[in-house]
Amino acid sequence: MEKKFITTQGAPAPIGPYNQAVLINNTLYISGQICLDPQTGNLKNRDIQDETHQVMQNLKSILAEAGMNFSNVVKTTIFITDMNQFSEVNEIYGKYFNGDFPARETVQVSALPKFVNIEISMIAVQSW
């Protein structure tokens, strides 16, 4: 089993003892991303749309570092603090995929790191 740690400056550095992503054989496991701007380290959290866009951009950068894109994503997990924002999240999230949506669950949680409103993790597979 080949294991490689994926790190890019296009996504924020981890805020705890974990890696941005781990590639094992042809499967990429991406740690949950929040709305930190990788250049400034500041939160982009004016509203749920801004947060979701920044999270998706962070995920896009990690995918690219591993030679992948959103078409390689097979599973996502979305954590949100307010299920009333579900449709707004879906509107932004859906724009990053070309209609071939991965499997997914969305879970409401009481709080997230740095008091953001959304966190998304992904699993992607290199073309077979």
Model-predicted regions and their roles:
Residues 2-128:
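Short, polar/acidic, helix-capping and beta-turn segments at strand->helix junctions
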